[in-house]
Amino acid sequence: GDLENIALEVFINLGNLNYLKNINGLITKNFCNDKINFVENLDSLSFPAWEDFPLENYWKLGYSHGPLSEKKYISVLSSRGCPYPCNFCVVPKTNERRWRLRSPKNVVDEIEYFVKKFDVKEFHFEDLNPTVNDSRIKELCNLIIEKKINIKWKIVAGTKVESIKSEETLSLLKKSGCNYISISPESGSKELMKKINKPFNYDHALKIVKGMNYNKIFSQACFIIGYP
């Protein structure tokens, strides 16, 4: 489930293990409580209160999930969950293979808000798979282009490369300021991919990676070394 509706109660009672055992939606090494409902309308959530977080400390140290092009950046979560069944990953169980999305307008509104508030020019998308819906990612790119929002943005958490459908999508990503995409092929072994239950189209993946190179979008591939 999602933490928003129980976060305050959890933080207030962090030191009280007996109390935490009664809050649904929590899992620890000692207990696994019942699930809680997901937030169905992600657009209904407020933008993150980054003003209450020591962003300057992270900027000074250069800490980030993806490589930095600017001194200042902010993380964005434009969707939650993942529809794929990979058996090495906790997400299919915790999110029931559901991919929930924010509207492109809501995401771009958040970007605009933090550009104005913090003079930030770089955004790191932390979604597990922000490119699952091709029409949605294109709409998001087009909104950034139409609004003339001058930013760099990166997909940093390892999106499924085949969910990037075409060279047209790559071109829009580039025009909107995307200059880095982390992808997750996991392995070059088709036998291992079957074992981890991850469908993968190698031919399409290679085509998209070549398209990234052509559009000068830096790519990083994540691999699993050793699978029990």
Q: Which ranges hold each PLM region?
A:
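Radical SAM [4Fe-4S] cluster-binding motif and immediate context
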Residues: P48-Q220, I225-Y227
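Glycine-rich beta-alpha loop elements in corrinoid/cobalamin-binding modules
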Residues: G1-N41
